[in-house]
């Protein structure tokens, strides 16, 4: 008896789905999930997996540092230009004072950006920062930051640090830790459905306790 091509393809899809589910349950998802990773220098290091809130803060800090570097470069160029013009001491003193004021303004802007009180204000600050550091041309980075801002559960460094400490104590795989920090699961059953590898690793009661603590730490804009 001949088996139709469509039937064969359907069976293959089912087998593939079963295989994918089994791999997800054991985190057999490729080399990038191995606990030991090789960095660009050829050195072995521990796997790092970030939840959405951590990723958001890392990128924000990188953008802030880029703006500071840009401002320092501008200041250095300005001083070099003044030196070539043989500015007198009085003028130089005034310029140095202006530089200090500019530095204070930059630090104030950075502080406001890192501690934005509302999602809307943070998105506005992101637009300004990207304009200053990338010319506003990096749409992918802008979309990434918008996504992270909209879906991050924990807003500030202190809260993210508390989340890291809480989840680190579980002894779970870094990927599982990152997923628990990103997904707003209400029950242990939901968490184990979305993160199949948690089954047989942690009891429902313990997982419920962790989910409750994560919910208490969650920041509402």
From Swiss-Prot:
Keywords: Acetylation, Cytoplasm, DNA-directed RNA polymerase, mRNA processing, Nucleus, Phosphoprotein, Transcription. Residues 71-83 have a biased composition (Basic residues). It holds the Pfam family RNA_pol_Rpb4. GO terms for cellular component: cytoplasm; nucleus; P-body; RNA polymerase II, core complex; RPB4-RPB7 complex. Its main location: nucleus. Residues 1-23, 71-120 are annotated as: Disordered. Residues 92-112 have a biased composition (Acidic residues). The modification Phosphothreonine is found at residues 91-92. One of its GO terms (biological process) is mRNA processing. Belongs to the eukaryotic RPB4 RNA polymerase subunit family. This is DNA-directed RNA polymerase II subunit RPB4.
């Amino acid at each position: 008896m001949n088996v139709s091509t469509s039937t064969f393809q359907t069976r293959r899809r089912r087998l593939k789905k079963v295989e994918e589910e089994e791999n997800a349950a054991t985190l057999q998802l490729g080399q990038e999930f191995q606990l030991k990773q090789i960095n660009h220098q050829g050195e072995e290091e521990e796997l790092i997996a970030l939840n959405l809130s951590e990723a958001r803060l890392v990128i924000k800090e990188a953008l802030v540092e880029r703006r500071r570097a840009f401002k320092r470069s501008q200041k250095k160029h300005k001083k070099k230009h003044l030196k070539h013009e043989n500015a007198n001491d009085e003028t130089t003193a005034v310029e140095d004072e202006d530089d200090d004021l500019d530095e204070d303004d930059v630090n104030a802007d950075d502080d406001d950006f890192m501690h934005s009180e509302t999602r809307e204000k943070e998105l506005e600050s992101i637009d300004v920062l990207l304009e200053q550091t990338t010319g506003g041309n990096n749409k992918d980075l802008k979309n990434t930051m918008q996504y992270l801002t909209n879906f991050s559960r924990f807003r500030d460094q202190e809260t993210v640090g508390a989340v890291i400490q809480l989840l680190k104590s579980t002894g779970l795989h870094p990927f599982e830790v990152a997923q628990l920090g990103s997904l707003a699961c209400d029950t242990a059953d939901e968490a184990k459905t979305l993160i199949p590898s948690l089954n047989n690793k942690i009891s429902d009661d313990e997982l419920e306790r962790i989910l409750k603590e994560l919910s208490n730490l969650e920041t509402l804009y």
